[in-house]
Amino acid sequence: MNTENLLIIDGSSFLHRAYHGYANANIIDESGRQISAIYGLVEMFRKLERKITSTAWICVFDPAKSKSFRYDIYPEYKKNRTKYEDLEYQKEIVPKIVSHLGITTIVDDRYEADDIIGTLAVSLFDKCSSILIATGDKDLAQLVNNKVKLINTMNDEVTDIKGVNKRFNVNPEQIIDYLSIVGDTSDNIPGVLGCGAVTASKLLQEYKTLDEILKNIENLKPSIKTKFINSSKE
């Protein structure tokens, strides 16, 4: 595989978007099961192919049935998400279909797509001139660097280091700490109650890391200090 200009696709993100975007397509297979999301996914790939020139594509999916280690750490993880029966079947068969399109496809029962995408971005860094990650997931902003960029195919917006700075007011390497403070509602992960994006970015601009914020908790404004202490008790 020539990975000089690599495109990594967050297949699970694409499939969920296709499920909602093509909800009225009503496309069924020979057994009468809905496959509108898969049809939409393929259409999204076609549009992507017209927009992007890459020497290699890799598409990564979440496991369809098994749960990652995150559920053991935090049982409430993603508990707020609605399950759609007609999507669950499509999750099971889509990796094989994408593979038949000639696209390198990866799914691992132990890990989510994000984990694998992160591993690929790091392990293939020295072998690539550029890595473009197609996703709508803000978590992956932590991977952005001088070679790695994100593209949101909803609006064709490409996010580089400056783009991360502009959107979050922090650097890519601070995204994990930023999300730890503000929380992630899409994954049902609480942050520091009462600390929003503005507070989080200001704290990280001053102290650089969450560890340093906690080490200097006595120096924080009383109201912010209280929020951190109260959140640590929950």
What are these regions (language model features)?
Residues 2-134, 140-158:
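Noncatalytic, basic helical substrate-engagement surface that gates or grips nucleic-acid strands
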